[in-house]
């Protein structure tokens, strides 16, 4: 059968939302008990509508992308139907504690997020969480709502980070509403459907350690090992092995952040994933003009979470996790006394934490070597990379474009230097460095074209710059969601040229320098 231009093909039937709802099931975390979670329905969100949707995240969950058009989709993924769910099936908020800006903050918890269950697909299970679904027992002074602005930023950055190859939570959808909420100004509400294999944070362990609840602490550790670190079960000390794996993943994650110029903004221990995922997208930012001291969070007046500080803070956060796990480390070994076990546990934990620099450093060096197009490893490579970063810092050269344009530099002469050279104020400094770089490239067997292709596979052309997100947000506030979709599509192919979208890779406009992001959302 064929259709003429004047005839429309019959529309495919929309997915059955009831089937999706039926597939949701209680996840293993809530089975840990009432000490871990509180069940409650989401707060009603009036007249919800779809702002953004990720086909890719839907497929990861085994869902049809056409689900977004199914009747009731926006209602379900803002949590409205949960008011009618039986008590035993209600969503839940989890409790945790943590250090915020280096200070013990005590009990925190999911103050505006509810986990509605999990979906299984391709041998993996994914938890679905609604961020902005209303007040919980852990909301403190908050209203439990997320705003459209921050929800769009989280949705877009979740997509961007995933397609950059950086471990991250995902975002299935953003649901908006005209319901007003008060922040620094009047804004409107939104809910993000976040997806991850687990939302367990360092702060979950800190909570039960600080409250002297060893049984719950052990149950939590056993849950994480059983579900996500099964190899740790066979280790001589499973809990020490858990610390080692979480520390390694954290070190490697932050190395990936540094390699793309990503600043998280709020690296509190309650924002650190036990799985080594980027989690809790708040006042984040990708660096434009490079500044190693760059602080993306306007609320971070002391610069604790500056770009250059992220590795040190991640290491410190792992110490906090280690402290929380100390009561468990060594339980599988015979010890003459509890004091002896505890003393040995401290020694073993310090040994694990001492490996962080040797995990982070080589991971970052490998990433930077690839960004420079160096297939061979040479003793002076780290110094060459550091010299580049120093002159980038001095000239405030654009981070993303500098590395992307380096692919045009030839090992033979300076004819390809102009695009990257023009990013530097001190061009003599760049010329001196470029001569060193060319000399290093002469030791490589690859020709310029092969090297450039390899570099363009690791140096993105497109990242989520703040002004791009701001443009999409401004249009979304006028009920035009096309820019959210367009920008998300570009960010799903960050390494491709996409010449029709060159404007998204351009240097930021002057007005972008006035943008500020903070913890206000």
From Swiss-Prot:
The annotated active site, in chain numbering, is 270 (proton acceptor)
Which amino acid positions bind Mg(2+), per UniProt?
271, 280
Name the job this protein performs.
Nucleotidyltransferase involved in the post-translational modification of proteins. It can catalyze the addition of adenosine monophosphate (AMP) or uridine monophosphate (UMP) to a protein, resulting in modifications known as AMPylation and UMPylation.
> Which residues are noted in the entry as ATP-binding?
109, 111-112, 131, 143-144, 194, 201, 280
What broad taxonomic lineage does this protein's source fall under?
A: Bacteria, Pseudomonadati, Pseudomonadota, Betaproteobacteria, Burkholderiales
This chain belongs to the protein called Protein nucleotidyltransferase YdiU
Query: Needs which cofactor?
Result: Mg(2+); Mn(2+)
What Enzyme Commission number(s) appear in the record? 2.7.7.-, 2.7.7.108
The protein's UniProt keywords, in alphabetical order, are: ATP-binding, Magnesium, Manganese, Metal-binding, Nucleotide-binding, Nucleotidyltransferase, Transferase
Q: Name one GO molecular function term.
A: magnesium ion binding
Please name the PANTHER family in this protein's record.
PROTEIN ADENYLYLTRANSFERASE SELO, MITOCHONDRIAL
The record lists the catalysed reaction(s) as:
L-seryl-[protein] + ATP = 3-O-(5'-adenylyl)-L-seryl-[protein] + diphosphate; L-threonyl-[protein] + ATP = 3-O-(5'-adenylyl)-L-threonyl-[protein] + diphosphate; L-tyrosyl-[protein] + ATP = O-(5'-adenylyl)-L-tyrosyl-[protein] + diphosphate; L-histidyl-[protein] + UTP = N(tele)-(5'-uridylyl)-L-histidyl-[protein] + diphosphate
Q: Which InterPro entries match?
A: SelO
The source organism is Burkholderia mallei (strain ATCC 23344)
The family annotation for this protein states:
Belongs to the SELO family.
